[in-house]
Structure formats: C-alpha cells, structure tokens
Regions:
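Bacterial N-terminal signal peptides
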Residues: 6-14
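Structural detector for short beta-strands of small beta-barrel domains
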Residues: 90-104, 140
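Short amphipathic alpha-helices in soluble, non-transmembrane regions
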Residues: 40-41, 75-84
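Short nucleic-acid-contacting surface segments enriched for D/E, G, S/T with interspersed K/R
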Residues: 124-139
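Sec/Tat signal peptide C-region and signal peptidase I cleavage site
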Residues: 15-19
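OB-fold/S1-family single-stranded nucleic acid-binding modules
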Residues: 145-163
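N-terminal targeting signals for Sec/Tat export/insertion, comprising classic cleavable signal peptides
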Residues: 23-61, 65
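OB-fold (S1/OB) nucleic-acid-binding surfaces
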Residues: 103-120
Length: 163
C-alpha cells in the first residue's frame, strides 16, 4: 500500500512542476566593483534551481538561467539584490505559468511559487481569452517595485501556449 501511494505521488510530481521561471534578466543599480558583482553572483547561485548566473559589471545586467522544474520566486531574486545593498530595476523574464482570471483581467500564476501577475500587453493584442486555463510561456518585463516588494503586473511581449 505504501509503495502504491509513493508511486502515485511520484507520478504527480511532474504535473506540479510544469511551470517556472526559465530566465531572469535583472538590472542592478549601484553595482560598481568586482567584489560587488561577485557578491550578486554568489547570492543568485545560492537560490535553488539556478543553473547559471552571468553578471555584467559595465551594464549592471544580471542574467539568470534556471533549471526546469525549479520553484524559485521573483521575491528571492529581489532579496538577493537588496541584501547586498543594491537596488533592482526592471526585470525582463521568461516564465511558464497558468493563465487564470478573465479575458478582461487575465492573471498569470507561476506554479510552485506564490507569484501572480496581472497580464498587460506591450504590443499587438493577443487573444488571451482563448488561453484562460492553459499553460503558457510568457516573455515580458516586470517593472521596478519598491524595496521588499515584487511588481504585480507583467507587461508581456510574447505569450505562447505550451503544447
């Protein structure tokens, strides 16, 4: 019986982990020396699910690529910046999630996290109504949020249903 229950739970794991951040490009303000860049690199690598971190000291851009099935949250990335004494600016992200809400007020829920974003198009409108209840990959920008907060609106450039 225990083996059957364990096997059933293991079979459900891939379903629970079907959505996550794939890449986060975060602009960090105030990072102006090699030790600063190293501190950000180490902090980001300490977040479970992070595969690679590239820090460009000249532009302040931190590029984070994540493993499939991760449960990292945007709050963790922001906290990694803030705990090192820096400020985060807009973040460009690629994320998988489920579209909920209504056609006039769609929401992206990032499964495995508490992250939820109101979806706002930046270019030509996409028929979001047909995506309600479906898993999608979204590319877009999270605007800068106050310290300790995460933006609540994702200005998306692309949104594609995951097959």
């Amino acid at each position: 019986m225990k083996k059957t229950v364990a096997a059933a739970l293991l079979a459900l794991l891939p379903l629970a982990a079907h959505a996550e951040y794939e890449q986060v490009n975060l602009t960090v303000f105030g990072m102006d020396c090699a030790p600063c860049a190293h501190a950000i690199h180490v902090s980001m690598k300490g977040i479970q699910g992070v595969n690679t971190v590239d820090v460009d000291l000249n532009t302040g851009l931190v590029t984070i690529k994540l493993a499939p099935g991760n449960s990292a949250s945007m709050r963790q990335f922001n906290q990694a910046v803030e705990k090192n004494g820096f400020t985060h600016k807009d973040a460009e992200i690629v994320v998988k999630g489920k579209v909920t809400g209504t056609a006039s007020a769609p929401v992206l829920e990032v499964t495995g996290t508490e992250d939820r974003y109101a979806l706002s198009p930046t270019a030509a409108n996409v028929d979001v109504a047909s995506l309600i209840g479906k898993t999608v990959t979204v590319g877009g920008v999270l605007p800068q949020a106050p310290k300790g907060k995460v933006a609540d609106t994702l200005r998306y450039k692309t949104i594609v249903e995951v097959q």
